[in-house]
Amino acid sequence: MLFRKHLFNSSEKNRIVAAIAAAEMQTSGEIRVHIEPHCKHHVLARAAEVFSKLDMHKTAKRNGVLIYLAYEDKRFAIIGDKGINDLVPDDFWDSTKEEMAKYFKEGQFQAGVIHGINESARHLAKYFPHEAGDINELSNDISEG
């Protein structure tokens, strides 16, 4: 795989942010994407660290989801907050991760992330449907490390 200095250009980032906004119309859950070139620790530990730094645990229903990518190390994770984890099976994110990995192996990073966003929203909507008056509690922007 050939990597660029930055994983996504501004147009690709805009499409991802738009996908997050659209996905959050299906669920009261909050979805964020964080990208960085390297992950020096275990990928889930780093994702949890980023989750905390982004204050994702401060949503009213504790239903935030982080899609974390360390693109040069070819590692990624999806983690959810306590409100989600208390309701779903341990393997809740596995199928979404497997599908995203297929896109990534083909070098289709934007498509893989958008697929992950859409699938996350679809799964979350079963437990946390969108509600009238729902507010966007977290930024939809991609964070970078």
Question: What is each stretch, according to the model?
Answer:
Residues 1-145:
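A structural boundary signal for the start of the first folded domain, especially the loop/turn
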